[in-house]
Design a protein with these regions (language model features):
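Short, basic/aromatic beta-hairpin or loop at an interaction surface
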Residues: 1
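Conserved NTP-handling cores and scaffolds of large molecular machines
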Residues: 22, 42, 78, 94, ...
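N-terminal intrinsically disordered, cationic/polar leader segments
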Residues: 226, 253-256, 263-265
Length: 265
């Protein structure tokens, strides 16, 4: 196979999954794999041989198709016609990507189908919390569904995740706002005031109320969306830190996102 390197370089890109056939042999007292044939591995052609992308990279433990169906139920509960059309348009237009996309590279839900798991979890949390407050239920639900939508274009969803050019230069909140605005143009008579509120939810959800920062959550729904996101992300991060800690000590080490020893029991 080393005789065909120039041709193979044209055939593959970094991060492609490969299907190989060949045999092993002993060379200089070491076992070597001699590859006779190599192709890009796809489910379409190699699924019958057991190829499954979810077995190659870290993936959600939940079934993506079932999560998608659960999410559609929540979206279809939105009674505001324009808002329902907007959310459905955004999600259905990117369904294929949403089913597999991670929610981040190094933070919470940083695995295959992580984005879908994250937004579904936040929507389920929102449904439970909304009855306790005098807030617009549908605005909160729409908020948790839209605040992370920019990650679909911020990072790549292949076997090796990395930031896209747009992700590096703009960031996912700006990208999410663009996605919102593009979709709103396709919904006839979409309310201007509602769009402005949705934009604010997207731009303010990560703000930690630090001095001299812009776009702080400035109405009750924005504040609730902010805390739903923060609570869910931080708890998942803490769970991951505990699960990944290999020591038998009662506490984890200090070198983690929270910079503190976390009780594991």
């Amino acid at each position: 196979i080393w005789d065909n390197i120039s041709e193979l370089n044209k055939k593959f890109e970094s991060g492609n999954a490969e299907a190989e056939s060949g045999y092993t042999e002993i060379y200089l007292d070491n076992l070597h794999l001699v590859i006779k044939k190599i192709n890009e591995a796809t489910v379409q052609y190699y699924g019958r041989y057991g190829f499954d992308p979810a077995k190659i990279v870290p993936s959600s433990k939940k079934n993506p198709q079932k999560m998608w169906e659960q999410l559609l139920i929540i979206i279809n509960e939105i009674k505001n016609k324009e808002l329902h059309k907007l959310i459905l348009l955004i999600y259905k237009s990117d369904k294929k990507k949403i089913l597999i996309h991670p929610a981040s590279i190094k933070s919470s839900y940083n695995y295959r189908s992580g984005f879908l798991e994250q937004v579904l979890t936040m929507a389920q949390i929102a449904k439970k919390l909304v009855p306790f407050y005098k807030v617009d239920r549908e605005l909160v639900i729409a908020g948790v569904l839209l605040i992370k939508i920019g990650v679909l274009k911020e990072i790549n969803s292949g076997y090796i995740t990395d930031y896209s050019k747009k992700g590096k230069l703009l960031g996912q909140s700006v990208i999410a706002r663009d996605i919102l605005n593009d979709a709103a143009k396709k919904v006839r008579n979409f309310p201007t005031d509602l769009k402005i509120k949705l934009e604010h939810l997207i731009l303010s959800y990560e703000n930690n109320f630090q001095p001299n920062t812009s776009y702080k959550p400035s109405f009750p729904e924005a504040l609730l969306v902010h805390y739903i996101y923060k609570m869910n992300s931080n708890i998942r991060l803490m769970e991951t830190i505990i699960a990944d800690d290999g020591d038998e000590n009662e506490f984890t080490g200090l070198h983690n996102h929270f910079r503190l020893p976390i009780l594991k029991v």
